[in-house]
């Protein structure tokens, strides 16, 4: 048996070495056939002797058993997006702001890889968890799929615990091979490598993900306490030394002129790369200066992403159709002859409003120039006048709503036409779609087509009806089998424990966006407190103006809305902000004013349910264990947070002890 163990160890060493040489250094020392031979030898040993298979065995690269779903996991620290720059003027403003704050600065310029942002967690040198970015606060656990990417080390040679972040992507060669295989099987090809990478990492069967030949570039460290770096460039160098793959085209520069030179170089050379990039990232290099500059709610102040100019193409405008939004705004949409733009086929594009159509003299039948705003949303820029046909048709907006026939109005100071019928079906359906969206209640599986069917079948008339749905309501719907229905009902049940700000945003109160929902929920803590708020009190909150304050108060004073809230409460939908200030709640003395961390897998409730219950007791629930943490509630496989709590001497409870205390309090 000792001979088997030594051979397994040797195979691990050789396979990890060859994988690193091929996928990270791009300099293989042996042919593929040698790697395959050794891998199959290890697979045979593990098949005959399962006790020799480890979590970090090179054989996990080929994928394992299929999962039923991806678990949602909170990030230890948010994965923020970057602010955007679209031209030299934007970059010079960024540079001036930086220098006004911290004086002289060195920048690190890096290629912006066009893929899927991921977070990789290592404990004692072993890769233990990988998450998608998700909404920045909560991502999906795609660990098994990420293990199939050879550029991600399953373990490193040092016993460190840390988190790194980067971009998973599909090399152009892999993309071509994948689409050729899809074409041969008469399957729909992927539009671009980014979509292919995202689709591959969301495969429930990791064996399928393994076949897609993805790669990754790491670009940041989440916590520098385990690193010796003082700068971004030193951090990337240290990641190189640990065996991670970082992009080697990075460059340190001293001036904004050097930044522009770097951008110009890669604007011209981007098509020569073996992977797609969609811009350049500019970061303040010194970590101390990064800390001084800090963050906004959405992004770091010390970094910016320059986006390459959008590709423009010409196609024919076939027709103009109207869509009705959840607030009644009527938006004209161009129906186009399908055309490829920035890697995807576009057949529809926004025309924004009637004034834009007339100001730009855009007519049905014209050849029009379209581009993707921010490389995402297609829009019509202008008509090509010298190609205009004689029968090009001037477009006139209708006087009545195409959904409910109610008269359309233009509110003073607005350019959009609006349907003000509160019973307009199109608005109601759009409101339901908004309620379940990712930044609102985030109900997986409840898409547009299902909502439309449920509305047409009179199973849902308002957002509260969603929480009253049964298996009998869902099974008759198109393409809804037993498993899909169970998953959807579980997602609906899970949404009940969402935080107050998600509910507020989901209700679709006019002028109330994600950020304002967060700020207002944090300020008032519960929906019942908001029922008593005045416009003046709301306007005391930073960034809340008169229009928003008036809209919120008017909405919550409506008796129909109060009845809707009661209907939601009857189904135990949470009405409390997850981080509600303990001073505003009576709470329970065992938890009031205490800082508590939940870690590991809970079986008798979800993390959100536990967090909301603790908030009701006056506790502050956080993600990180520090010396100031009062209590850690540890479920199964608690990991590094439990170890840190033991190190600090923090009080630790099991899930069973926590549930027992809940039962005592609730009688």
From Swiss-Prot:
One of its GO terms (molecular function) is DNA ligase (NAD+) activity. Its cofactor is Mg(2+); Mn(2+). NAD(+) binds at residues 32-36, 81-82, 110, 133, 167, 283, 307. GO terms for cellular component: cytosol. It is an enzyme of class 6 (ligase). One of its GO terms (biological process) is DNA repair. It catalyses: NAD(+) + (deoxyribonucleotide)n-3'-hydroxyl + 5'-phospho-(deoxyribonucleotide)m = (deoxyribonucleotide)n+m + AMP + beta-nicotinamide D-nucleotide. The keyword Transmembrane helix does not apply. The active site is at residue 112. Keywords: DNA damage, DNA repair, DNA replication, Ligase, Magnesium, Manganese, Metal-binding, NAD, Zinc. Residues 586-667 form the BRCT domain. Its EC number is 6.5.1.2. InterPro entries: BRCT_dom (IPR001357), BRCT_dom_sf (IPR036420), DisA/LigA_HHH (IPR041663), DNA_ligase (IPR001679), DNA_ligase_AS (IPR018239), DNA_ligase_CS (IPR033136), DNAligase_adenylation (IPR013839), DNAligase_N (IPR013840). The keyword rRNA-binding does not apply. Zn(2+) binds at residues 401, 404, 419, 424. Belongs to the NAD-dependent DNA ligase family. LigA subfamily. DNA ligase that catalyzes the formation of phosphodiester linkages between 5'-phosphoryl and 3'-hydroxyl groups in double-stranded DNA using NAD as a coenzyme and as the energy source for the reaction. It is essential for DNA replication and repair of damaged DNA. HAMAP family: DNA_ligase_A. This is DNA ligase. The lineage of its organism: Bacteria, Bacillati, Bacillota, Bacilli, Bacillales.
